[in-house]
Design a protein with these regions (language model features):
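Phosphate/pyrophosphate-binding catalytic cores of soluble transferases and nucleic-acid-acting enzymes
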Residues: 1-4, 8-289
Length: 289
């Protein structure tokens, strides 16, 4: 068993607290991949992730181990499991620059309103502040005349080349939201503001992919004098709750998902693990020694 992260922020060095990056002592000797592989100013998106992930998986299979994809970015997981082909998505640099300028002059909401008109499904799933994804969706529509959400649904029907199990752990919504708020309070006490300040001193700015992550864009707005720290934390908690809701909506649309309600297992991790191993055995993916 070797784990690969499907969480964008964890690929970046110097971004530990806001991404809740696993510490070496927590890995328990299990190799973890796609952690600390990029500098914060480097570009990262699903195509780059897919390439890195598939390369790691080949290496893991060559060692007769089983890769475990861990994380909450459903589209990234789908890109690997379904082998989504991104080669047809040629970039329209001139149109992209036009959209980037529009976002700079009129704010990200202006792009999001444009997206609502041509692709309401994508607009529902993409946060208004996620300029990169909004531009990518608009660019795809400009190039093809088809909403990227239609393309993504079509790609979901691809047959996966892998024999896999897809587990989604869920919980009572109020408990989930309470954990989110507690986690953010903990990140603040661990020094999230200082971490973002260090990134800013290194030259990281709002438009960078790394700074689009939850926790980073809100605190950066505070450090840039755009809001108070109290407002930044409030926005972070609200947007993280909304993100969790969108995650669950995404996973509900996925096929072949095994839902695990932690409450039904009395929040006992050993019981949950035994259940997972039993399913892996039934699918002949893993045999317990």
């Amino acid at each position: 068993r070797q784990r690969q992260m499907c969480i964008r922020d964890r690929v970046y060095k110097h971004m530990d607290i806001g991404s809740a990056k696993i510490r070496p002592e927590e890995m328990e000797g299990v190799p973890h991949h796609l952690i600390d592989i990029l500098e914060p100013w480097e570009e990262f998106h699903v195509v780059v992730f897919q390439k890195h992930c598939l390369e790691c998986m080949e290496q893991i299979y060559d060692r007769s181990h089983i890769p475990i994809l861990v994380g909450g970015t459903g589209f990234y997981i789908q890109a690997v499991l379904r082998g989504i082909d991104f080669t047809e998505n040629e970039e329209n640099t001139e149109y992209r620059k036009k959209l980037e300028l529009l976002a700079e002059e009129q704010g990200p909401e202006s792009l999001h309103e444009m997206l609502k008109k041509v692709d309401p499904v994508s607009a529902e799933n993409i946060h208004a502040n996620n300029i990169k994804r909004t531009i990518r969706a608009l660019e795809y529509y400009e190039l093809t005349g088809e909403p990227i959400s239609v393309h993504n649904e079509r790609e979901k029907e691809r047959t996966s080349p892998y024999n896999f199990s897809y587990f989604v752990l869920t919980d009572d919504r109020e408990k989930l939201y309470a954990r989110i708020e507690d986690r953010i309070d903990e990140m603040m006490s661990q020094g999230l503001v200082d971490e973002v300040r260090q990134l800013k001193d290194m030259g990281c700015r709002k438009g960078m992919t790394s700074m689009q992550g939850l926790g980073y864009k809100e605190i950066l707005e505070y450090l840039d004098g755009e809001c108070s720290l109290e407002d930044a934390v409030y926005t972070l908690k609200r947007d993280t709750r909304h993100f969790a809701k969108r995650q669950l909506t995404w996973f509900r649309r996925e096929s072949e998902v095994t839902w695990i309600d932690k409450g039904r297992f009395d929040y006992n991790e050993e019981k949950i693990l035994e259940y997972m191993i039993r399913e892996l055995g039934e699918k002949e993916i893993y045999e317990k020694q």
